[in-house]
Each structure stands twice: as structure tokens, then as C-alpha cells.
A protein has these predicted regions:
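Active-site phosphate/pyrophosphate-handling residues
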Residues: 10, 40, 55, 65, ...
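Charged, amphipathic alpha-helical coiled-coil/dimerization segments
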Residues: 50, 72-139, 158
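Short amphipathic alpha-helical interaction elements located at domain edges
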Residues: 127, 140-159
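Short amphipathic alpha-helical segments with heptad-repeat character
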Residues: 9, 13, 17, 61, ...
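N-terminal leader segment of winged-helix/HTH proteins
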Residues: 1-33, 44, 152, 158-159
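DNA-binding alpha-helical recognition surfaces that contact promoter or target DNA
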Residues: 58, 69, 132
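N-terminal helix-turn-helix DNA-binding core of bacterial DNA-binding proteins
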Residues: 21-66, 147-151
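Alpha-helical structural segments
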Residues: 14, 18, 46-47, 62, ...
Length: 159
């Protein structure tokens, strides 16, 4: 039987724990109240103004129900607003508020520091290989996820 400490799944889970801890520490250092999924949502809404919740969930690979709670908390904090779509009265579009845009701008340099923290033990060449392999594995396993990423990179119809 393989040692737990050599199993890819265990190591990936540990790295995720470390990444979340680093994110929380950097946000606390910056005095910002933001989680990794909230940052992903704000960043994606910024890049896709008027996105609907189902599309947003696909763009950040999160299940719709959980993301609904995330969007609700962002709305309660005054960081996003949901509006009835002019194209489809049944749909609700999500947009950043000025406060959401300001928070995203303030968080960006700290998020960049977190990313550097995560891979600081690797040299430049190792980082490139590591990120390439992570992308390869996540792309290859995307359809097996309970919340697959849905964007231009993973949509075969757009390739």
C-alpha cells in the first residue's frame, strides 16, 4: 500500500489547504474581508459584466447552489448587485458595484503575492513545468468534476 504522503490526491488536498491559508493570511494582512471563491467571483464578474449566476458558476468551476450563497453574501456586503436582464426577464444579471470594483482593485496585488507564496519553493523553470502539469491534469479531468469549468479553453465546440 502506498504511503499517504506520496498519493497525488493527498498532496493536492494539502496544497489546497496551504493555498487557502496563505490567501487568508494575506487578506488579513491587507485588512480585506475576502475569500478565494469571493475573489474568483468578483474577478469573473468584472471580466463578464452582466453575467448570470449559472454562467458564473461554470466560469469558476463552482456548483450553482454554493455559488448562489457566495453571490448573496457579496450582495449583502454591497459588492455586487443583481438586476433583471433586459434580454430575458426571468434571468438576473450580476454586476460589480463601485465598492466591489474598489475591493477587487485593492485585493489584486495581495492575490498576486499569494500566488508567488504558493510556488515560492520552486525555481522559475519548475514553476512553469508545475503550472503546465496542473493545467494538463485539470483540463483532462474537467468533465469528471461535480462542477466542471465551462469556458472557451474547455469547450470543444469553440476549439
Amino acid at each position: 500500500m502506498s504511503s499517504l504522503y506520496t498519493l497525488p490526491g493527498h498532496l493536492i488536498r494539502r496544497l489546497q489547504q496551504i493555498a487557502v491559508a496563505l490567501f487568508a493570511a494575506r487578506m488579513a494582512e491587507a485588512g480585506l474581508d475576502l475569500t478565494p471563491v469571493q475573489y474568483a467571483a468578483l474577478s469573473t464578474i468584472h471580466d463578464n459584466p452582466g453575467v448570470d449566476q449559472a454562467t458564473l458558476a461554470g466560469l469558476i468551476a463552482y456548483d450553482r447552489v454554493t455559488l448562489g450563497g457566495v453571490v448573496e453574501r457579496l450582495e449583502q456586503k454591497g459588492l455586487v448587485r443583481r438586476e433583471v436582464s433586459a434580454r430575458d426577464r426571468r434571468a438576473r444579471e450580476i454586476r460589480l458595484t463601485e465598492a466591489g470594483d474598489d475591493l477587487l482593485t485593492a485585493a489584486l496585488p495581495w492575490v498576486e503575492k499569494v500566488q508567488a507564496d504558493i510556488v515560492e519553493a520552486l525555481g522559475a523553470e519548475e514553476r512553469a513545468v508545475f503550472l503546465s502539469l496542473l493545467s494538463k491534469l485539470t483540463d483532462a479531468g474537467n468533465d469528471r468534476s461535480r462542477a466542471p469549468l465551462r469556458d472557451d479553453r474547455t469547450d470543444p465546440a469553440r476549439s
